[in-house]
Design a protein with these regions (language model features):
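Bacterial N-terminal signal peptides
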Residues: 13-22
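Electron-transfer interface patches adjacent to heme c in soluble/periplasmic c-type cytochromes
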Residues: 79, 100-160, 164-168, 197-207
Length: 237
């Protein structure tokens, strides 16, 4: 009898152990599935969404596809870079494609105006009596480098530190300082409108992705604005 009880106890223990192992394995699979899903949310699905939403044809020759797709996602979905780096709200969207309007002016489908896409020229001025701040042209020039020919190292300097490499608006320091200078407390060495204090917290991988995407979009000559020749790109090679 005692042996029989021992056998039953051992059998019950084996069943309980098997169930516990099964539960543990199933839980592990669930965790792995959740981790895989989270990884995908930061991987291929975002890359594909980036390709889905880009409004312009892309030159992928010599480019890293994954970086281009992720860069498009950051630029077009997360950052809404075109909201500032186009000529302004009036021309940001194509005719009939402005989602802020109502029917029948808005036809129901958002359509970005490719003629002004990321080409800069939005006026954020005036500051004071004469100073106008214009968003920069982010498209590549005829060198193939974005932001009007910036190297990746220069791009990182802009994004991490807000450095205005064009030095468009110097600090007002002397009577002969040009009229487009910055009065204190503003620092003319830095970009004053761009949200670089937020962008500087991006990872190196994210900055690489943005740069790769901007390298893949078409060159846009940019708007012709008096006193702002720095907005224009040379597209002809």
């Amino acid at each position: 009898m005692r042996g029989n009880n021992l056998f039953k106890t051992a059998a019950l223990s084996a069943v309980v152990g098997t169930l516990a192992l099964a539960i543990l394995m199933n839980s592990s699979k669930t965790v792995r599935a959740s981790q895989d899903e989270n990884a995908d949310q930061n991987g291929e699905s975002l890359i594909q969404r980036g390709f889905d939403v880009t409004p312009v044809p892309l030159n992928l020759e010599g480019k890293n596809r994954a970086l281009v797709g992720l860069g498009s996602y950051i630029v077009n979905v997360v950052g809404d870079c075109n909201g500032c780096h186009s000529a302004g709200p009036a021309t940001e969207f194509a005719s009939g494609g402005n989602p802020y309007f109502r029917s029948p002016i808005f036809t129901g489908t958002k359509v970005v105006n490719t003629a002004t896409y990321l080409a800069g020229g939005r006026d954020f001025g005036p500051v004071g009596s004469v100073l106008h701040l214009y968003s920069r042209n982010l498209t590549p020039n005829n060198t193939g480098l974005p932001v009007g020919g910036r190297t990746y190292e220069q791009f990182v300097e802009i994004m991490r530190h807000g450095t205005d490499l064009d030095h468009i608006h110097p600090n007002c320091t002397a009577p002969d300082t040009p009229a487009n200078c910055f009065l204190p407390p503003f620092n003319g060495d830095l970009l004053q409108v761009m949200r670089w204090p937020s962008f500087q917290n991006m990872t190196d991988h994210q900055l690489q992705a943005i740069y790769e995407y901007l390298s893949a979009i078409p060159c846009n000559p940019g708007p012709a604005i008096a006193g702002a020749p720095y907005l224009q790109n040379t597209c002809e090679k």
